[in-house]
């Protein structure tokens, strides 16, 4: 299964590590993973939020499922990605407290 990782980035400093840890765990479980941090690494730092989101949404549409990291509801981008995933009838996975 191809899984897109979704979570809070803006306003955090540890997002690269958090997304990398989730990516590693999902790959160990045998999944192909779309990590938006890697997908957006070509974007010039300081670019508008919408520039990142357009790239992320294109990547999301290539996935079969979305993995919602803890705290995703605090992120406007992650909430938008979740709404798109629901509209596209994707599998919705959510990080548990112990994950």
Q: Where are each of the predicted segments found?
A:
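Conserved catalytic or regulatory cores that recognize and/or transform ribose-phosphate-containing ligands
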Residues: 1-99
């Amino acid at each position: 299964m191809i899984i897109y990782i979704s979570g809070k980035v803006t306003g955090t400093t540890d997002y690269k590590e958090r997304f990398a840890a989730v990516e590693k765990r999902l790959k160990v479980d045998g999944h192909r993973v779309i990590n938006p941090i890697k997908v957006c690494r070509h974007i010039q730092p300081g670019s508008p939020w919408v520039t990142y989101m357009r790239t992320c949404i294109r990547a999301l549409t290539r996935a079969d499922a979305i993995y919602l990291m803890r705290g995703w509801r605090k992120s406007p981008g992650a909430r938008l990605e979740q709404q798109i995933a629901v509209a596209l009838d994707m599998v919705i996975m959510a990080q548990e407290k112990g994950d």
